[in-house]
Amino acid sequence: MKGLTSKIPRALQTGSKMVCADNTGARVVQIVSVFGYHGVKNRQPKMGLGDLATVTVKKGTPDMKRKLVRAVVVRQKKEFRRPNGLRVSFEENAMILLNENGDPRGTDIKGPVAREVAERFPKVGSMATIII
């Protein structure tokens, strides 16, 4: 997995509910844990754009509900700054579901995807219709 080109603020924490932006059958997911987070006792794990997490499906089709799956953040409301000075923010927080190999589980991504995520996950970038 490649490093990110921008310094992304970690604006999402465990327990946050987010929109699922793919066609896997999940509509709303909740963050359970963050991959690679080594924190301090009693500190909530935080994550930002392009980070992997384990999520549980809160709303969706009956076969997807209450499942633990991997997901990556593709949009975040909190603005971040790119090295060229451009500030980017999205209207909502959104994730897409991944399998164990890091490939998308769905076949379609709804809405835009940040360029940093497309660089880190090439298969997500090839599926996205809009890359900002």
Curated annotation (Swiss-Prot):
One of the record's GO molecular function terms:
structural constituent of ribosome
The task this protein performs is described as:
Binds to 23S rRNA. Forms part of two intersubunit bridges in the 70S ribosome.
Q: How does it assemble?
A: Part of the 50S ribosomal subunit. Forms a cluster with proteins L3 and L24e, part of which may contact the 16S rRNA in 2 intersubunit bridges.
Q: Which residues cross the membrane?
A: none
Q: Which CDD domains match?
A: Ribosomal_uL14 (cd00337)
Alphabetized UniProt keyword annotations: Ribonucleoprotein, Ribosomal protein, RNA-binding, rRNA-binding
Which top-level group of life is the source organism from?
Archaea
> Which Gene Ontology cellular component terms are annotated?
cytosolic large ribosomal subunit
Q: Which Gene3D superfamilies match?
A: Ribosomal protein L14
> Pfam families this protein is in?
Ribosomal_L14 (PF00238)
InterPro entries in the record, alphabetically? Ribosomal_uL14, Ribosomal_uL14_arc, Ribosomal_uL14_sf
What family classification does the UniProt entry report for this protein?
Answer: Belongs to the universal ribosomal protein uL14 family.
Determine if Cell membrane is one of this entry's keywords.
Answer: no
Q: Which GO terms describe its biological process?
A: translation
- This chain belongs to which protein, by name? Large ribosomal subunit protein uL14
